[in-house]
A protein has these predicted regions:
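Active-site hotspot residues in diverse enzymes, especially metal/ion-binding acidic/histidine motifs
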Residues: 1-218
Length: 218
């Protein structure tokens, strides 16, 4: 049995959402609106759990959890947490559904693998690697405070993202993983230019070639 985390799948699935979502126009964005747009999953606070006949103590210490109720999936989240924490927690649980994790095995030997994959999925949605690396190429120093203020994430999420990206070389990614790189940079160009304007001279030949490539995407 393969218990190794499937980072490639989590990365590609997150990229697919970034490309097709109309909810994500900039960063930060509403995790609840994204979940509603991309699925039939309902987001509800812990405070509304009683309405569904669920005891809040069943959640233990989790910040969010996903339940099957009446044939539908519901993400319950702890509304007392800070907004960045709630956002990440909701996307983490959303990741379980998108990555088609077997919930019957969530508490078994696959638990750790599932958690790592969904954390990676949520981080890529909230702080896309392609955008961070492009900002870095433009001369901006990437640190925890920058990620927190730019993407609306918690200090913990920002620090973990920096740690993860420091261990990865984007040049080693497969063609499937790189498929949406240019699309994502093009789609969120306004956000990029607002956060870190490109100071390099405009290259008409390069831009023409890029536009021809984009035209082939549609």
């Amino acid at each position: 049995m393969n218990l190794k985390s499937d980072f490639d799948k989590a990365y590609i699935k997150a990229n697919e959402v970034l490309v097709r979502s109309s909810t994500i126009q900039s960063f930060p964005f509403s995790s609840k609106k994204l979940v509603k747009e991309q699925s039939q999953i309902i987001c509800r606070s812990y405070g509304s759990a009683k309405k569904y006949g669920i005891n809040i103590t069943d959640f233990g210490s989790e910040s969010a959890t996903i339940f099957r109720f009446g044939g539908r999936s519901i993400i319950f989240y702890d509304e007392t947490k800070p907004e960045p924490h709630i956002t990440f927690s909701i996307l983490h649980e959303f990741g379980h559904a998108i990555l088609e994790h077997d919930f019957t095995k969530k508490n078994g030997e696959n638990y750790h693998r599932y958690e790592v994959e969904t954390n990676f999925f949520a981080a890529q949605l909230l702080m896309p690697e392609q955008i961070i690396r492009e900002i870095q190429k433009r001369g901006k120093r990437i640190n925890s405070l920058f990620l927190q203020s730019t993407f609306g994430v918690s200090a913990q999420a920002a620090e973990k993202r920096i740690e993860t990206l420091a261990k990865m070389n984007s040049e080693w990614r497969s063609e499937n993983e790189k498929e949406f790189d240019d699309v994502i940079l093009f789609r969120y160009a306004d956000f990029l230019n607002k956060v870190c304007p490109n100071k390099y001279d405009y290259d008409f030949e390069y831009e023409y070639a890029r536009q021809q490539e984009r035209d082939n995407w549609y």
